[in-house]
Amino acid sequence: MLVRLLVAAIMITFFVVAMRKPKIIPSGLQNVAEIMLDFVRIHIAEEILGKKEGRRFLAVLVPTFFLVLFLNSSSVIPFLNISSNARAGMPLILALFGYIAFIYAGVKRYGFFKYMKSSVVIPNLPVALHLLVIPLEFLSTFILRPATLTIRLLSNMLVGHIILVLLFSATNLFFWQLNGWTALSAVTLAAGIAFTLFECLVIFLQAYIFALLVAVYIDLSLHADEH
């Protein structure tokens, strides 16, 4: 909990400081913040939803992307060394946030009953097949989407944390053997540093993929009647 609060405080402080006195020609932290915000707007929101709907749902996609990004980053910060998303609670909350967003998008456009019908009923199917397809579509749309969002983020960050722990624990173990095994500490240390750099890439990719999937699910809800 303390790690999550600390990361949230760092994220809020970053954007408050960066955008406190915005300039027409950005520089410093404002430039970094605007580049990051433009990335979400152009490459996630507008890319998937188009300009009109993309701007409308920026209020969902921007906090989703940056919360995942900053919470993931704690896995490579010294003395923290574990992502808040390596535990089930936070990924589940983030997935539920996306879940509420895409259901809201569909209900807002079609109304509750039409949206539910459009989401689970595939037109022009034989009546008998509806008995099979409707439960599967309901499971896929309303159960598996938040579940897979949670599991994907949790598993990727947890696996990365475990590998880093193993590599640096092995480094410590081998180094203090003071025999032939000591030389291996250099190998595991180098592997740990290399994997830390790789984990930085994973941190960004997982934030991007998570926000991208939320955008895709919102888009599917907005076009639920287009089977």
Each model region followed by its residue ranges:
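Selective transmembrane helix interface/packing segments
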Residues: 1-227
